[in-house]
Amino acid sequence: MEDSQRGNASMMSMMDDPFVVSPEGARDPPSTNQYSTFDAQLFNLDASTPAQAKRALEAHLAETERRLEEASKLGTALVEQRKDLEDKLREVEQQQEEGQIGEELRRKLADLEREYNEIGQETARAFLAPKRLAGGDDGHLGTPSMDQKSPLHSALFAGQATNSPSKVSVPSRKSRNQSNRVHDIEFATEISTSLLAQVRQLQSLLAEREETLKTVNLEKSRLELEAEGYAQRIRALDESEERYKDENWALETKIHELMAAVKDVTDRETKLTSSLGAATAEKSAMERELEDLKQANAKLIEDHTAAQKANDAEINTLRRNLSAGDAERLTLQRKLEDMNTQNQELAKAVAMRLRQQEAESTREVVRPHDSEDEEQATPENSPPPSPNKFTPRHNHLETETLRSSLGHAHRMIQNLRSTIHREKTEKIELKRMLQEARDEVEQRRRDSVAANGPTNKRQKTKAETRKPARPDLLGAGRKKAEVEIHDSDWESNAGDISPTHKASNDSRDRRGDQPIDDRSDAYHTATEADDPFETANERETTTESEAFQTGVESMAGDSTDSDELTETEDRVQRTPRGRVSSMTLAKARDRTSYYSTASTSADEGDSTDPGTPSISQFSTPRYRLRKKRSVLRKIRPSGEAPMAFNSRPSSARESPSTSFTRDTSAAPEGQSLFAELAEVDGDEDDFGPPMQFEAASPSTPRMLPGFDSRRPSAVTVELPSKPDMVDSGVMTDPWEPNLHLASQTDDETVISVPVTPDKPTMSDASTGMDVVESPSLVHSSTQWTPLKPNAETSDDHVLSVPTPPKMAWDGQTLNEERKVDIPDSPTTQRELNISSVSFEETEPVAPSFPELRTAFFVGSTTEPVAAPVPVPPEVALSPISSQTTQPTEPVIPAPPEPEPIYVPEMAFSQILVEDTLPILAKLPEPAPERVFAEQGTSTDIAELSVSAISSEQTEPVEPVYEPKQDVAIVAEAVPEGPLSFVEQGTNTDDVEISFPAISSVETEPVAPVRETKDDVPEPVLSLTEQGTSTDTVEFSVSSISSEETEPVEPIREAKEEAAAVDDVASESTHPVLSIFLTPPAYTEPTAPKLQEAVIPPAPQLALSTVSSVETPPVQYTPDVLILPTPPALDENTPPSVMASTAKATKSAPPLVVVDDNTDKGTADGLVTQQNGVTLPLGAISGNAAPRRARSGSSNQADQGAQTILSSKQIDQLLIDRASVRPLSPPDSDKLNEMSNSPFATPKARSRPVPQASNASLHKRPGSAASQASSVQIHPPLPADHKEAIMAAEKKSIDQRPASAGLMGPPLAPASAVRASSQQRPRTPNESALQVGSAKTTTSRASVRRDSHMSRRSSVSSFASELEERFNMQPNPPFAPQGYSTGTDPRMIQAITQTMIGEFLWKYTRRAVSGEISNTRHRRYFWVHPYTRTLYWSEHDPQSAGKSEGRTKSVSIEAVRVVADDNPYPPGLHCKSLEVVSPGRRIRFTATTSQRHETWFNALSYLLVRNGPEDEEAENGVTLDDIDEFNPGFRSRSRQTARMSVSSSQSRGTRGLPKQRSGSAMSLRPSVTPGRASPYPPSHYSDQARQASSSRLSTIFNSTIKGSFGRKGPYAASSLNEDSIHNHDDSVEDLRHMMDRGDDVDRLENVRACCDGKHDVSSLSRTSRYSPRANRIHSHH
């Protein structure tokens, strides 16, 4: 056994011997293990930080050193032992002879030697480097050599035995004699063996100890890491647990609310289903009844129509026959009388001649026949001739004359008879054709109506659209409707008689002149006599038309009672089928009107204006026209009918071209030919009714009631010189076309007068054409609706007659007719210049009236087809048709090319380019990097004296800055860049050049923005949507107007040098604040971290980069915000940065920022001067210059300026940041969290519980930025302040009246009840919590304009404010009857009015989605104040019966004001009220701003007043009351001002800020015991949903601060709407004036636009292309 052990030991020694290497070299020398092995496990435990790796390496190094130390100690001990053993061996060798060593002893010695060697080898292997190995290169490096000096040589024991245990040696005598030494040797050997065993044991123990220690250390480090991870997880889980607990409570509350809402909805659904069933049944019954009525009505209508047609036809026939017979009889009687008279004269003349001849024959004196005395008249001085005295007579001439006259009379009688007969035939034929055409059209109309469906059919049966009776079929009044059919062959001289110029007129007039009947084959159904009817060129070639009447004759269709006809009978409403009398197609005063076969000067009075519809022809006295050469002095413009201007459709009158005709005076309509001729001549002996010159008005045409009621053309034409005229009354005079000078000029000159372009819309008459006279027959259906004339013919009685709209076919001919009319005459050109002014797109369509019966003109589309109209080159009307857009073009100057060279007008050109280039060029010192947020940051030039930021109102306040005090505000949103301030750039010498970098895209190019005093070509303000432009001092307005960069609360980082810029107070002249423009891409401005970049002092730069994006300017207010320039510290800000920031903050001067809030002139953004308190969320205007604080109220932030980021960007940011952050913020971060900058992106609070008390006690910051350093500013709180606050909160929570439908809230903060305000996305001002209830900084004592209370929130002032707000008097003497003591008596009147109710315009709901539509209907609204219920019905319930209509109602949960740009129906207020109720929204609009305010005030007050259900809590201070007096955290229900105008003024308050996103809401406190509101008690429903979702989403990123789910707590609407007076005309204007007066000593608001109406900061934060961006302020 011992041998085997020795063998094993030897084998182990061979294996483990470091000096022995196998010949194959399979083992490498363990040189790498000189030190302790590297513990890879230690580094596998998430050595994610350099510090952890460093700790691992240090541990490894210490371990290695320890092991080296222990190895050295062991080696030393072993060497000493070896020396001792060698000494003893020598002694043994010396004493060998003295004692005999036995085999056993020798064996032990050999074993001891072997073990010694093994120990030495192991020791050497463990502690010695390989280089210390002995041996040569022969491959036996480790084997014992024969060297005697080798410690491994067996000869070491030579003194005790032979060289080899196997060597046979004879012991010396001395050894043998000294046998007693053997025992000593054995003893020594045993000792050595035991020692070696102990050494080996100790070595093994040491190795085990080392292994154990290493394992323990590794385990310890691993456990430490795990413990740290577990601690973080536990901390996170604790936070999540609290959040989940609150969330669960909130969700449970919501579940109950939703269950109640579902129950309500189910009930409503049941009711609605039943209502729907009833309505459906009612509807079906009504439809059946309606169908029955329709059928019955249709049958009756058809019967009636048939009967009426038959009656009309019969009556027409009878009247026609009667009138024809009467006219023929009268005519023949007149002719007979004429003939008798002529015959009597002739007989007298013959008898006289016979007597003379007899007398001559009785005389004996015979005169020679050739005597000249026959040719001489009796001398004047001769005595009167005696009967027997011979007086020379021209008997022959008289005889010939009488014979000629008699022949002419016979011929005339024959012609008239043939004409009468012929026209009778033609009229009968035409009437038949017309009747057939009407029948066919009626049939077609019925067919088309039937095809169109029941809607059109039903509409057709309405009274206003029913086909009117046609008086033209009744016989008497048809004389001007008659179509004269001219047969060119019936009279041989027709061709000679017709004026030659009429052919051209016909060619032009073809479209308008020809009756519609001739246009379509459909109307030639039964006529075989097409040839006898007029052809295109025959119109004025014949003499049968009434133009040739002499007054004693009457046309066949004329009746004796024509003078008694009423206007309706005469000017009948005709369908387009009525043929136009050819007389209407003749030019006014055409030669043909005088060319009568038997006219005498006495008969010419009857020649009426051929173009007039004969109303005046038969009604005006027939004066004898006094022939003058001046009669034709003025000729009616071509195509101008007497009624044309005023009777044209309103659509034409409203067109821009009407300006051509408006300023010309014209004779009134309806004048006779005499009147019009007299009007032209103007002599005192002219005939006709007096002229009344009425300016043509664009209103619907007015007709004078009498027969003279037609108004001549409104255009007075400038004609060529008066043509020479001769008396043309005698038939025998040769027709001289030259006398009628206008005959040729009618086409060229007269026609060139600007015809009112509107008239082309008349399709059937020639009015739109170049006929110089008034149109023939005007179809009332297309032109005007004639009214019955009054008996008197006074021209003063004017009726407004609606004109029908343009017909479908009118549009087809419109262009052609217009082309003909417009010449290039100077008059026309002068008139055309106005067209650009008429850029008004007055849509003439709107005035169309229902009376226009366009349905009847089915067939009239064919009319324009026939004769092509030659278009004269003068035609210039086409631009009029496109007038609507053309005027804009002339107005727009050619846009100057945007060049970097400064062009004052160009404000847009360089916006795009502006982005970064100007900054680089201007950087004076490269030291601090400028981060240009992709686009906006403009490097400001230091010398820009104006706070170049929107220098709009920059009253240059002299900057008192020290150059080192530049405060740089960097939005964290641009993470990469060191402070991107233009501040450094400001030192650049280009003093005046204010960067276009503010490139605000919408900056109105109004004023050339900057004057570059240097030649530096400043890029013209590039209006890139965001930059606030730094303007030089002079340009107060310039580019800022549209700058949409709404500085999202830029956090100003104060350099340590940032000195008290306070002195700059009143001077905002600090040069360009280059606003760090983040591009519209919303670089997310999460709380900007302080950058330590050293900025070269720019003496005047106050704050440079305000990172703001896209704030379309809304009303500008010059308010100044004084910011203490707090550093924006994130939770993760390193301590060193925090320290430097704190120091910088103390030294940094407050920034004075122009307030950007919309409605308040001064109050909103400003800080009260004493305390510097500022609107926590108010956007910092880029021009803010540090300056002395000025007293002003601080605004609550109603909408976060942080809303620049979209939700996707925010989520991405959070994900990116989550990976880098520690899971839980260190405790030191809580301090940062408490003092987070108001401008930092709001962070979702990770643990609500520790700050539970703070939730309800949010402090009002001492100044806009004081929140960042609130911990340092305020006096220390007592050590147990949190416990005290928690106890107080708990007490107040317990005292709240319990809601019956809600579960008991958790003992956590009231956030569970109020939709957990802790977790909802916060406005920046919420990020700073004040710990402690005694917020008694002196700076808070200034007046609070927002909440109408002082800013002090101590217990006493809080109580007094409660008394003031809620009228809490300990023992109120009385309360208004019917109202609780909490009712503001000033609101009772408004509430009473709403109780009584009125008609408002309610938006309907879409049938499918139930969303609010764009249409409104009128409903009667009233309110029940106690139940807070809004009722409405179709009728006034006071006057309507019980059966009339149903009343609907909703419970009023909240009311908001929304901007409303819906133009229909016109005349309503520009804002609507939206009442939020469980499950739906009701939106309605008041008629005036006063009514709007009354309703909004009353509804708001009802929601916020103390109702009976919560009166018991009135005198108790609850968490809601505490929140009430913390401006940023008032409960939503009280977020709107409750005071009437008088009360708000009496308390010296300012108006609340105007809405930012387009709506304002009042919310009712949901403490009604029996109702579980589906909306969170103090939040909008949509916000509650988003807030809860954001809470859920952020629970998983619990330690990531800065997540917020929406763009601001009130993104839906600004609750600080100027509640009681939010319309433009209200008291706010006065406040604006007062505030402006207060602000004269302050900075100009360089971010204002629109003359101060808007301010960039308060504009919508959404993208400029989002639908809501321009709701409130459609800027530019």
From Swiss-Prot:
Record GO biological process: conidium formation; maintenance of protein location in cell cortex; microtubule cytoskeleton organization; nuclear migration; nucleus localization
Disordered: annotated segments: 1-35, 160-180, 353-394, 439-712, 1027-1050, 1176-1201, 1220-1270, 1297-1354, 1511-1589, 1654-1676
Bias (Acidic residues) ranges: 678-687, 1511-1524
Stretches of the chain forming a coiled coil according to its record: 51-127, 193-359, 408-453
One Gene Ontology cellular component annotation held by this UniProt entry: cell cortex
Xref: Pfam families: Mcp5_PH (PF12814)
Membrane topology: Peripheral membrane protein
Ranges of biased composition (kind: Basic residues): 623-636
Gene Ontology MF terms: phospholipid binding; tubulin binding
Feature: compositional bias, Polar residues: 1-11, 609-620, 647-664, 1191-1201, 1314-1341, 1534-1548, 1580-1589
Comp. bias (Basic and acidic residues): 355-370, 439-448, 461-470, 479-489, 503-522
Protein name in UniProt: Anucleate primary sterigmata protein A
Organism listed in the record: Emericella nidulans (strain FGSC A4 / ATCC 38163 / CBS 112.46 / NRRL 194 / M139) (Aspergillus nidulans)
